[in-house]
Amino acid sequence: MLKRKTVAIKDVYVPVKRRQTLDSNKVEALAESILAKGQEAPILVREDGTRFVLVEGLHRLEACRALGETTVSAYLVQARQH
């Protein structure tokens, strides 16, 4: 079962490859939705030392950041072994 927690946005690292897929129109639409309904779906992160690495939810993360939020709801997932 996934562990849900609130994490500081500043502690979430977004890998460069993932950051390149950012769509500002999606961020804007999600920000409007979050204002109206709150954050309905947590992002997915994995622990990496003292920070969290984003696994899924870039647009949700950036929408929360754009709204001036300092924390985001997240599910903590296990890192995949390669």
What do the predicted segments below correspond to?
Residues 81-82:
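Short, charged recognition helix plus adjacent turn
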